Amino acid sequence: MIFSMLRKLPKVTCRDVLPEIRAICIEEIGCWMQSYSTSFLTDSYLKYIGWTLHDKHREVRVKCVKALKGLYGNRDLTARLELFTGCFKDWMVSMIMDREYSVAVEAVRLLILILKNMEGVLMDVDCESVYPIV
């Protein structure tokens, strides 16, 4: 029963009108994905993280990128992120130009983890877009 409730919770809270609730939800989904990867590191939950990469509020985007850093920082989990990475890589690369400094910094840190832990995912052109920033 609890697992059933937890399955429905992200769907409701990731679309909440309050950015604070969306940020908390994404942060917790990231924790669940790391702790209970067999149940939560799936496309049905990763889509919420992908959607919030585009959120209009800075704090939500920061929490989203930090959640992704936790996942991409664990080599055991990166193989399960291949489809997600293929879908959202271009957006993650473009986030280094985010108007909010904190989001851009976290995006660069995320790309460094992707470069280290997922060989061949970031192309030269992706890396070249980071060089002027750093």
Swiss-Prot record:
Q: Which UniProt keywords apply?
A: Nucleus
SCD domain location? 10-95
Q: Which gene encodes it?
A: STAG3L3
Main location class: nucleus
Q: Which domain of life is it from?
A: Eukaryota
Output a single Gene Ontology CC term carried by this record: nucleus
Carries keyword Nucleus?
yes
The entry's family comment says: Belongs to the SCC3 family.
Where it sits in the cell: the answer is: Nucleus
Is the Nucleus keyword given for this protein?
Answer: yes
What protein name applies here? STAG3-like protein 3
InterPro entries linked: ARM-like (IPR011989), ARM-type_fold (IPR016024), Cohesin_Scc3/SA (IPR039662), SCD (IPR020839)
